[in-house]
Curated annotation (Swiss-Prot):
The chain crosses the membrane at residues 125-145, 150-170. This is Acyl-lipid (8-3)-desaturase. It comes from Mortierella alpina. Fatty acid desaturase that introduces a cis double bond at the 5-position in 20-carbon polyunsaturated fatty acids incorporated in a glycerolipid that contain a Delta(8) double bond. Involved in the conversion of di-homo-Delta-linolenic acid to arachidonic acid. Essential in the production of eicosanoids. It is a multi-pass membrane protein. Changing residue 88 to I: In strain: ATCC 32221. Disulfide bonds: none annotated. Pfam families: Cyt-b5, FA_desaturase. The keyword RNA-binding does not apply. GO terms for cellular component: membrane. The lineage of its organism: Eukaryota, Fungi, Fungi incertae sedis, Mucoromycota, Mortierellomycotina.
């Protein structure tokens, strides 16, 4: 792509070009000024603004066919990146190219749109319908309002529906895997702000720019970010403290606080520290500012202010807590069963900041699937039981995962890349508990 001539950029110099009027990014050590391409980008303006001022190699290669954008990018080449902010991966191997070609071929040969399936919209309707109906029942259906236990039941349903907002419209939108319309992605993403009170924008930094490119890499994947000391020890290279003993017996109970933690953390990330672990936050657009604060305000209004007009404070807090904890537990347990388990890998860069592993192979080796044969678990986890499939092809609708699984597993077998899968969710979660137990043990050198 382009010539070898041009200016050299350190990652700090690249980072300064991170606005709508001055937008640079790097791919495979080559820097591009895509400011004039911004309005023509098929993936929308927001996508490029998120990647502005950084090396987006793994993200770019996730969402584009190899070589497909070379002719376009050649026009915008301006120089070479000479230092790295985050870990760097080798050129794609034969395994990576083969698995990508085979899956892309599956869709083109059958003339199937990988981003569209009719059942997407039916599931969204069920999620939002059950959320609104369960909320309404808690406040306005006399038969329910007169029975606290029934209100709690509907609060549980509502909490589960809120979790499904995160696992379906939010998650699909953040990977551009539903329709080809960036406006649809923004609207679906905003449902997370309004119904869950948590930021779609922060999620994009954490998930799309952090977790997916750098899965399980300490210091780069925000999903496994920890403090020192931290309440839990999840990474092999993380320092052990005495409070980690028997962590498998108490840490999972803390997962019920996830939603509360995220809502507060959002504000800190966007407006104070301006980074999510190692993922820098770029200037915030007017749209995202309105969605962020509008979402926070709407969440407080519908979850607290409106209920207080009809129910006593104690009951409002009870129902709020029940729904929040159900949502938190479901999301946390689902996430942990995929990556924070005993058999996955925890890659680390070498002294030059290079991960000595093909990116696609790393995605498979840092991920655990489960319950492939269960349509129920596929439905209620947003297809995260096909997590390795999702990590390799995040821009493909989750409803296609079962159809391309055989291609992926066969290719992994052919190239001797171990594919980890458990028969049930409970086996997968047991692996998470065992991982906590082992890392909670006092190290021999202590």
């Amino acid at each position: 792509m382009g010539t070898d001539q041009g200016k050299t950029f350190t990652w700090e110099e690249l980072a300064a070009h991170n606005t709508k009027g001055d937008l640079f990014l790097a791919i495979r050590g080559r820097v591009y000024d895509v400011t004039k391409f911004l309005s023509r980008h098929p993936g929308g303006v927001d996508t490029l603004l998120l990647g502005a001022g950084r090396d987006v190699t793994p993200v770019f290669e996730m969402y584009h066919a190899f070589g497909a954008a070379d002719a376009i990018m050649k026009k915008y080449y301006v120089g070479t990146l000479v230092s790295n902010e985050l870990p760097v991966f080798p050129e794609p191997t034969v395994f990576h190219k083969t698995i990508k070609t085979r899956v892309e071929g599956y869709f083109t040969d059958r003339d199937i749109d990988p981003k569209n399936r009719p059942e997407i919209w039916g599931r969204y309707a069920l999620i939002f319908g059950s959320l609104i109906a369960s909320y309404y029942a808690q406040l306005f259906v006399p038969f329910v309002v007169e029975r606290t236990w029934l209100q709690v039941v509907f609060a549980i349903i509502m909490g589960f529906a809120c979790a499904q907002v995160g696992l379906n419209p939010l998650h699909d939108a953040s990977h551009f895997s539903v329709t080809h319309n960036p406006t649809v992605w923004k609207i679906l993403g905003a449902t997370h702000d309004f119904f869950n009170g948590a930021s779609y924008l922060v999620w994009m930094y954490q998930h799309m720019l952090g977790h997916h490119p750098y899965t399980n890499i300490a210091g780069a994947d925000p999903d496994v970010s920890t403090f020192e000391p931290d309440v839990r020890r999840i990474k092999p290279n993380q320092k052990w403290f005495v409070n980690h003993i028997n962590q498998d017996m108490f840490v999972p109970f803390l997962y019920g606080l996830l939603a509360f933690k995220v809502r507060i953390q959002d504000i800190n990330i966007l407006y104070f520290v301006k980074t999510n672990d190692a993922i820098r936050v770029n200037p915030i657009s007017t749209w995202h500012t309105v969605m962020f604060w509008g979402g926070k305000a709407f969440f407080v209004w519908y979850r607290l202010i409106v209920p207080l007009q009809y129910l006593p404070l104690g009951k409002v807090l009870l129902l709020f807590t029940v729904a929040d904890m159900v949502s938190s537990y479901w999301l946390a347990l689902t996430f942990q069963a995929n990556h924070v388990v005993e058999e996955v890998q925890w890659p680390l860069p070498d002294e030059n900041g290079i991960i000595q592993k093909d990116w696609a192979a790393m995605q498979v080796e840092t991920t655990q699937d489960y319950a492939h044969d269960s349509h129920l678990w596929t439905s209620i986890t947003g297809s995260l039981n096909y997590q390795a499939v999702h990590h390799l092809f995040p821009n493909v609708s989750q409803h296609h995962y079962p159809d391309i699984l055989a291609i992926i597993k066969n290719t992994c077998s052919e190239y001797k890349v171990p594919y980890l899968v458990k028969d049930t969710f409970w086996q997968a979660f047991a692996s998470h508990l065992e991982h906590l137990r082992v890392l909670g043990l006092r190290p021999k050198e202590e």
